[in-house]
Amino acid sequence: MNKSKAQQIFGDNAEAYANSPVHVRDDSLDIIEKMLAGYNFEMALDVGTGAGFTAISISNISHTVLASDPTRPMLEQTRKTSISANSANISVIQNIAEQIPISTNTVDLITCRKAGHHFPEFDKYIHECSRILKQKGILIIADSISPENEDLDQWLNQIELERDPSHVRNRKLSEINMILNKYHLRTVEHQLTRIHLSFNSWVDRTGVSKSYKNHIQQKFINAEPHIKEAFQIRSIDKDILFSWPCAVMKCVKSV
């Protein structure tokens, strides 16, 4: 993760993310739970845990869960939410995703939900996942993705970067699959969904100034018709509703 920018954004706005409905629970978490139904894991790791909502979910099917994040205030939120949820088997560790302080071939399950687009070295992160997973261990990726169309890809990522300086890239599904294959992680199940957002709360979470908020808002209002259609952009009352495409992937270490 882009450590300094991410720590500033998420550290300053940890409580806002802890109370964000799309981070607490959305379709992606429901899909993860369905993909993992019937499993029981000894050791699980949630990377980029944020306020710990995914870690809490997998704690119900895991003996031990490590919740990992580079930002201390977010880990404090994880502690609070895990106590509220009576999830006593969650411990927190502070590290960046590309450097995971865990021994090789020791983890049964890794989850990463809504965090991968902040990792500057996503390739290195996936390599780390492959290293620490046991053979036939499971990696779950749930993240907003970019369309394969170059125009849509550029518009989405530019907007995200203007709203959030810690944003690195919403990757195309083809990019993610290429990296997974490189490190012997085979996708056995995947589902596409949408992350539904409202402009005001989406921008306010990152603490941008009022003038810059207006600047970003105009880009939504003045977007080309094909962009509005692709991202379901529509004005309602004094807000703008839109959605990003999201992929949920279940991968198995094959060597």
Task: Identify the residue ranges that each predicted region occupies.
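Conserved Class I S-adenosyl-L-methionine
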Residues: 188-255
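Short catalytic micro-motifs in class I SAM-dependent methyltransferases
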Residues: 114-115
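Conserved class I S-adenosyl-L-methionine
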Residues: 1-39, 53-57, 74-77, 140-162, 201-203, ...
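Short alpha-helix
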Residues: 169-184
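Class I SAM-dependent methyltransferase SAM/SAH-binding core
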Residues: 45-99
